[in-house]
């Protein structure tokens, strides 16, 4: 088939009863004085650029009466739903649940419209996010209401009485980093209007929480609940601590009274997490998977099983009771089923066969002989790490399974599974951009490894074709492209490789050997960064290293910059605090962030994860500590940013959530670190800061990546306001400014990109003036004429996971202080004064005539005219319309040209105009243009240059370029 090539203009760049009433999320309270109105930023738009690869999920549920309907809760990406057994997924709580971390989902069996969601994941790895209580929907996820338990923080399970949707139980784990009383099993009998704590550890209520629950489907007065005492010190990288107090409990009166179960179960001080399930076909059969390493086991500091060859007695394994929990037998002690229990320990039972059960670990294991033997039914060589399985109580062949790679569904009894390559819920730690055109974004995805995504696709949409795993970097390291060759990638601690060839690029040298008395330390993520001043490459552990030959050789340029004897936080319990006396010694800190000065190659700022800031002014020969006095040990310097305009200025984002402090902290210095100010007005509690970046082109314009959303400051941090707009609430981990684009890495929704954010720069210069104007046209950003090859072959089915290309055309932003009395018009004028493109707000939108087309209506979506409502808006001006087909639908040719209505041109020109609207003749050529906005008879203009495609040196000289009959 002939493949047309059109020229498009694209802008890239838990017996004391406690009654609790619902409370509101605290993070809603903050000082917003001095902010610009949200309408002044409303036209700025975020674009999801993938990758189309699922991220870590924990909570899953289904609707027994609608067998193709399932729900999943991403640990950072919110609540999602499928109505076609996993063929496609869509988010259902982005506007109803203001937190991305989901720990539990339960659908009421007697009324599937009632859904309860518990926020805050219970798999409390070192990188996790908190919750803000329980939410409820009564319309199958369309709308949501917060119903309390905000301070429970992490919720492991919710169960609903099978006969009464208003009787619900919640297993609350509590705060991870401090003691708090909101732990245990909570019950509501009025649908969440009020809560009563019905199970907790009376002798230690502030440290022992609840993590799992099971209900007898035939007698809902019978419940089983597991208690778990756990905590994390701020230096912990892997397993959390286990404290005394855990165990399995049973109630036979709907939660009024409870009894601890023993009769063969471990009851020592080393009992960890326990998963429990009741066989629906025989409720006397109860299953449990128990984490218990035993008193004789020496626990390594990083967690995991005991050292090889060490004699020990453990209580871990799979247990079965055939008398409703009175007595238990350990039927299987294989460590593959229960090891690393803090991260797993979940079990599910077939609804018909009580001997058929599933245990969840690095693989999903099935037994059909009552637990004697298990075989994996889902798992890959890398160890996918699975978490929860929901089995349809009316059809045991249908199930939904969560994992570190996303959520999958089986409709044939675990023989085959749906894909997780249709869930844009990746957890990305950092973001970097290369200098190719179009450019790529890079980062490390938790549990899946390094990933690169293209920000533009010649197919018109971003799909599986436009991202790829990187040739290096594990799940947590930085991925940094070479500034001169985007194919060469560097992975923090992993070396260097050629992405195009998928081959390692020899380094020729290694990091200098560590001092045997001070061995190299590391944490989950370590920084690696190129200096913008001289392209030196920096890397760190407790030392800072530099390479001037792109990693072929390295020199250590600092002493150990972490604290010598960091204090133990007062928020820790005594047992967890002892963790600091491990054989590794009390040295845990590392240099967590590096900020080379973009304007002085000899100046480098660094911050540690245990709360210190240093700076060198002489290439690393000498280092000076310049830590703000208010900072204490274990205040993690999550990012330090050297100013692009002043060598004495730097910004440091400080994360203290590991000290149970969720307040935001951004320190600013203008005198080389002598004095610091905490500049966070406008950022609420809960939004602790993961990164702060300065705009490289506009002094005083700052961006902050927080645990809840992105914030922007137009006045050097004195005042902040949300830059959320259409982006869902999620943990934002990193930011990079690339040309005129703003890219972020999120911990639950992958990479997001704001195309052409130049309006932010203009607001930083004269925002108050713009706000006061009746209308204002912003200066467009850099724009390029690029070839957009149409589909080569049939388009991807719309069910395939896809996201949109950047808008095609000159991206015009405009502000209307109030709605004008007349229609507005925007034009693109060439150097001769001719209008090459024009759109008007009164252009009627012609609905798709489904009786006259030969494709589904999803393939023919009308283009909307520019808005004339109050606020900031954007519109893409282009002669040739985009021809992309995305999940949100494509766009058809634009409406009748507002500059030249039908019938106003000579016949030949009329035909040409019509053909052009169908993607006909040549699009906009490179050159100088003017954007003109007309509002109530007044015109506003701004210049724009359309640059040639950097990949096409002959562009501009070829007059026929972009013709409708061009073939490839």
Q: PLM features: what roles do these ranges have?
A:
Residues 768-795, 936-968:
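Extended, polar beta-sheet/loop recognition surfaces of beta-rich domains
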Residues 812-813, 820-839, 928-932:
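Beta-strand-rich binding/interaction modules
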Residues 22-26:
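Boundary at the C-terminal end of the N-terminal hydrophobic targeting segment
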Residues 835-922:
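Glycine-centered tight-turn motifs at strand-turn-strand junctions
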Residues 27-800, 807-813, 841-844, 851-853:
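Beta-propeller blade termini and top-face loops
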Residues 8-21:
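Bacterial N-terminal signal peptides
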Residues 276, 812-818, 877-879:
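Aromatic/hydrophobic beta-strand junction motif of beta-rich domains
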């Amino acid at each position: 088939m002939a493949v047309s090539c059109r020229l498009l203009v694209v802008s890239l760049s838990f017996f004391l009863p406690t009654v609790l009433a619902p409370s509101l999320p605290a993070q809603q309270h903050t000082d917003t004085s001095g902010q610009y109105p949200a309408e002044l930023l409303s036209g700025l738009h975020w674009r999801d650029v993938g990758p189309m690869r699922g991220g870590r999920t924990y909570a899953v549920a289904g609707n027994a009466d609608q067998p193709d309907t399932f729900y999943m809760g991403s640990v950072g990406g919110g609540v999602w739903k499928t109505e076609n057994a996993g063929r496609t997924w869509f988010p259902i709580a982005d506007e109803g649940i203001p937190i991305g971390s989901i720990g539990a989902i339960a659908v009421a069996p007697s009324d599937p419209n009632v859904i309860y969601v518990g926020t805050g994941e219970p798999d409390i790895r070192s990188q996790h996010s908190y919750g803000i209580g329980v939410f409820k929907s009564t319309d199958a996820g369309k709308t949501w209401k917060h119903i309390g338990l905000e301070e429970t923080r992490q919720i492991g399970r919710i169960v609903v009485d099978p006969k009464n949707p208003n009787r619900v139980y919640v297993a609350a784990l509590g705060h991870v980093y401090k003691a708090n009383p909101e732990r245990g099993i909570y019950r509501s009998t009025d649908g969440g209007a009020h809560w009563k704590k019905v199970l907790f550890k009376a002798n230690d209520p502030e440290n022992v929480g609840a993590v799992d629950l099971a209900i007898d489907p035939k007698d809902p007065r019978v419940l089983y609940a597991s208690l778990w005492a756990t905590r994390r010190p701020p230096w912990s990288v892997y397993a959390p601590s286990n404290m005394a107090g855990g165990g399995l409990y049973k109630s036979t009166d709907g939660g009024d009274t409870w009894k601890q179960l023993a009769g063969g179960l471990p009851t020592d001080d080393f009992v960890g997490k326990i998963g429990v399930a009741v066989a629906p076909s025989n409720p006397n059969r109860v299953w449990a998977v128990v984490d218990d390493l035993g008193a004789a086991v020496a626990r390594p500091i990083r967690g995991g099983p005991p050292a090889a060859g060490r004699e020990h007695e453990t209580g871990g394994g799979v247990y079965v009771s055939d008398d409703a929990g009175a007595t238990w037998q350990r039927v299987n002690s294989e460590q593959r089923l229960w090891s690393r229990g803090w991260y797993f320990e979940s079990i599910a039972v077939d609804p018909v066969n009580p001997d058929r059960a599933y245990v969840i670990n690095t693989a999903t294991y099935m037994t059909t002989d009552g637990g004697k033997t298990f075989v994996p039914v889902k798992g890959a060589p890398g160890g996918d790490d699975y978490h929860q399985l929901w089995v349809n109580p009316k059809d045991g062949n249908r199930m939904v399974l969560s994992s570190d790679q996303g959520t999958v569904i089986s409709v044939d009894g675990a023989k085959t599974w749906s894909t997780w390559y249709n869930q844009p819920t990746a957890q990305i730690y950092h973001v970097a951009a290369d200098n190719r055109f179009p450019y790529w974004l890079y980062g490390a995805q938790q549990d899946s490894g390094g990933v690169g995504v293209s920000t533009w696709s010649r197919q018109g949409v971003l799909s599986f074709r436009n991202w790829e795993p990187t040739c290096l970097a594990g799940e947590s390291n930085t991925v940094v492209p070479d500034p001169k060759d985007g194919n060469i990638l560097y992975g923090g601690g992993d070396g260097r490789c050629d992405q195009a060839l998928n081959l390692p690029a020899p380094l020729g040298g290694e990091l200098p050997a560590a001092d045997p008395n001070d061995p190299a330390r590391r944490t989950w993520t370590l920084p690696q960064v190129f200096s913008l001043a001289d392209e030196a490459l920096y890397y760190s552990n407790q030392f800072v290293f530099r390479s001037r030959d792109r990693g072929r050789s390295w020199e250590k340029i600092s002493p150990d910059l972490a604290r010598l004897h960091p204090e133990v936080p007062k928020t820790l319990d005594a047992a967890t605090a002892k963790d600091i006396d491990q054989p590794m010694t009390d040295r845990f800190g590392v240099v967590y962030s590096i900020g080379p000065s973009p304007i002085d190659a000899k100046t480098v700022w660094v911050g540690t994860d245990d709360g210190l800031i240093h700076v060198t002014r002489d290439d690393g020969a000498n280092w000076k500590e310049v830590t703000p006095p208010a900072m204490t040990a274990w205040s993690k310097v999550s990012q330090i940013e050297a100013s692009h305009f002043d060598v004495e200025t730097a910004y440091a984002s400080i994360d203290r959530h590991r000290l149970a402090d969720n307040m935001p902290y951004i320190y600013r210095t203008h005198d080389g670190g002598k004095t610091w100010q905490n500049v966070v007005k406008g950022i609420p509690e809960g939004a602790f800061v993961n990164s702060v970046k300065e705009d490289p082109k506009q002094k005083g314009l700052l961006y902050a990546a927080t645990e809840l959303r992105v914030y922007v400051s137009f006045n050097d941090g004195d005042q902040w306001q949300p830059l959320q707009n259409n982006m869902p609430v999620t943990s934002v981990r990193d930011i990079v400014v690339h040309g005129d684009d703003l890219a972020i890495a999120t911990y639950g929704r992958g990479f997001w990109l704001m195309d052409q954010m130049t309006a932010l720069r203009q607001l930083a210069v004269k925002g108050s003036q713009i706000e006061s104007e009746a209308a204002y046209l912003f200066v467009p950003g850099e724009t390029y004429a690029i070839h957009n090859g149409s589909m080569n072959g049939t388009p991807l089915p719309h069910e395939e996971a896809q996201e949109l290309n950047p808008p095609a055309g000159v991206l015009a932003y405009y502000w209307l202080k109030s709605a004008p009395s007349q229609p507005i018009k925007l034009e693109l004028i060439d150097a001769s004064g001719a209008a090459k493109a024009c759109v008007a707000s009164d252009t009627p939108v012609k609905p798709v005539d489904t009786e006259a087309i030969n494709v589904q209506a999803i393939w023919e979506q009308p283009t909307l005219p520019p808005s004339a409502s109050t606020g900031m808006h954007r519109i893409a001006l282009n002669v040739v319309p985009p021809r992309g087909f995305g999940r949100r639908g494509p766009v058809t040719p634009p409406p009748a040209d507002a500059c030249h209505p039908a019938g106003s041109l000579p016949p030949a020109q009329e035909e040409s105009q019509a053909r052009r609207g169908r993607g006909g003749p040549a699009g906009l050529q490179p050159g100088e243009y003017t954007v003109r906005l007309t509002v109530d008879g007044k015109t506003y203009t701004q210049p724009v240059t359309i640059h040639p495609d950097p990949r096409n040196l002959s562009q501009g000289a070829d007059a026929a370029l972009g013709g409708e009959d061009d073939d490839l």
